[in-house]
């Protein structure tokens, strides 16, 4: 399935129906009064966040969306039928942005959130509404109001428990494929992953959602490589799993390349809890691995893990699961001052 995380849409709510100017016409009723009905309200366009969706693919060929207009009122005080609302489902984590002002209208970051982006026009008034003691037979009615219209941008920022980060070709896709049911493409060349992939890893009796973020290169914060197309997805991850190719000549430089790009893009990203793993350890001798591991651990002043292609992933997944659960517990503390 294609992954689409940004689309531009033109939205037009339905116009209100016109009011009606009519009079009662019956046998033996010489002076029937006004009985024109009101116009129906135009349809709204409403967005709802759906936890079962993970891409904006539904909008690929649907860039102009218009709700139906209300029907005009008729005689016998019958109001016109209201226009039908349009309900649009988007993935959780979708931001709705005004294209002109670039203002975030709403951030649908929780399941089942509902937001009306454009409102349908009010229906016009029939001539019954203008009857008075001085005007017993009004012929005046009003037209329906036009529905709101707006150009918007939908931007999806993937919601996941763990985000796998690192330079291109460090084994991120392979890790996700091994620990989940993801069908991520794997290859021995840079930018095998050109869009975020999501996978669900089972850890004992629970599950965690893991996102494979495309490789980060120097100047990614300026848009180099795949740039902003994927850096934004890291903002919603609870934990970062930083994979580094152990065969890299300069381990610290390899770490800093990714770390610095995150900091330059959004300084808050480097405040996220990070687990650092040296990957592809089956390609080097144990003594060389230990030397690089200790060198990086001393530089970071924290533990660095090692991973080979044949290693059991459950220990790392359990560690990630524990960290994720801690984040969930600490999301909101109403008693914390």
Swiss-Prot record:
User: What would you give as a GO molecular function for this chain, any one?
Assistant: magnesium ion binding
- CDD domains referenced in this protein's UniProt entry, alphabetically: Obg
Which key words are in the record?
Answer: Cytoplasm, GTP-binding, Hydrolase, Magnesium, Metal-binding, Nucleotide-binding
Give the GO biological process terms.
ribosome biogenesis
Q: Where in the cell is it found?
A: Cytoplasm
Q: Which cofactor does it need?
A: Mg(2+)
Q: How does it assemble?
A: Monomer.
Q: Which PANTHER family match?
A: DEVELOPMENTALLY REGULATED GTP-BINDING PROTEIN-RELATED, MITOCHONDRIAL RIBOSOME-ASSOCIATED GTPASE 2
Q: What is this protein called?
A: GTPase Obg
């Amino acid at each position: 399935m294609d992954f689409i995380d940004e689309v531009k849409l033109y939205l037009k709510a339905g116009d209100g129906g016109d009011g009606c100017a009519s009079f009662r016409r019956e046998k033996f009723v010489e002076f029937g009064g006004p009985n024109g009905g009101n116009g129906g309200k135009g349809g709204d366009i409403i967005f709802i966040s759906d936890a079962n969706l993970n891409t904006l693919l539904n909008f690929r060929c649907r860039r102009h969306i218009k709700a139906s207009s209300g029907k005009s009122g008729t005689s016998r005080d019958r109001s016109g039928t209201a226009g039908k609302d349009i309900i649009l489902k988007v993935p959780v984590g979708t931001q709705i942005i005004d294209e002109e002002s670039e203002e975030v209208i709403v951030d649908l970051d929780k399941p089942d959130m509902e937001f009306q982006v454009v409102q349908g026009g009010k229906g016009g008034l029939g001539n019954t509404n203008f009857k008075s003691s001085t005007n017993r037979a009004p012929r005046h009615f009003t037209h329906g109001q036009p529905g709101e219209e707006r150009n918007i941008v939908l931007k999806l920022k993937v919601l996941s428990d763990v985000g796998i980060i690192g330079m291109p070709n460090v084994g991120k896709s392979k890790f996700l494929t091994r620990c989940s049911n993801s069908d991520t493409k794997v290859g021995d060349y840079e930018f095998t992953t050109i869009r975020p992939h999501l996978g669900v890893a089972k850890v004992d009796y629970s599950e965690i959602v893991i996102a494979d973020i495309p490789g980060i290169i120097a100047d990614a914060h300026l848009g180099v490589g795949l740039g902003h197309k994927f850096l934004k997805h890291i903002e919603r991850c609870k934990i970062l799993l930083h994979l580094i190719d152990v065969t890299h000549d300069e381990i610290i430089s390899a770490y800093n390349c990714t770390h610095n790009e995150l900091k330059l893009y959004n300084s808050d990203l480097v405040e996220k809890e990070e687990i650092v793993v040296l990957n592809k350890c089956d390609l080097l001798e144990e003594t060389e691995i230990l030397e690089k591991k200790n060198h990086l651990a001393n530089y970071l002043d924290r533990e660095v893990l090692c991973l080979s292609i044949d290693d059991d992933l459950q220990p790392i997944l359990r560690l990630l699961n524990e960290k994720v659960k801690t984040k969930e517990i600490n999301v909101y503390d109403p008693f914390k001052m």
